[in-house]
A protein has these predicted regions:
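Short amphipathic alpha-helical segments
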Residues: 11-38, 69-73, 126-127
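Basic/polar N-terminal segments that are highly enriched at the extreme N-terminus
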Residues: 1-2, 116-127
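An amphipathic, aromatic/His-enriched active-site/gating alpha helix that lines ligand/cofactor pockets
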Residues: 28-37, 54-109
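Hydrophobic beta-strand positions in extracellular immunoglobulin-like domains
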Residues: 9-11, 55
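Active-site-flanking beta-strand signature of metal-NTP-handling nucleotidyl enzymes
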Residues: 3-9
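Short hydrophobic/aromatic-rich beta-strand segments that constitute the beta-sheet cores
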Residues: 50-51
């Protein structure tokens, strides 16, 4: 089942450039996993980054985190931060929840029927 995580990274003083470099690396690693539907990263304030990640399945989430190319940059991102806040929308399985627990994830309710993957999604659609 699809789920989405929203992350807020509060970046340590003097670590923004390193953080952005590792963030760019992780976005490239994401492209190796078609089950990672979307990554969105923005910087709404100085020393703050917010991400939205959408995963098609629990397997795609775990494969993405298990990718050795991303493990170093992810660890560096965590080290560059004073605080990381993770919220999850959807219903990941027990194994994914165990991984997410390491990030102190909280689970949020979603309005009924409001978070689904379109079963006939077409990235080339003009409508």
């Amino acid at each position: 089942m699809a789920f989405m995580i929203k992350l807020r990274w509060d970046i340590k003083e003097g670590k923004t450039a390193d953080f952005k470099s590792n963030q760019e690396t992780l976005c490239k690693v994401m492209l190796e996993h078609p089950g990672v539907i979307s990554y969105h990263v923005d910087y709404p304030a100085e020393r703050v980054s917010e991400w939205i990640e959408i995963y098609a399945t629990d397997d795609s989430f775990r494969a993405h985190l298990a990718n050795e190319k991303g493990q170093g940059p992810l660890g560096a991102l965590a080290g560059d931060c004073d605080r990381i806040t993770v919220r999850c929308f959807g219903n990941p399985d027990a194994e994914s929840r165990e991984i997410l627990a390491g990030f102190g994830t909280t689970y949020c309710d979603t309005a009924p029927g409001s978070f689904v993957l379109h079963p006939r999604a077409d990235r080339d659609s003009r409508v």
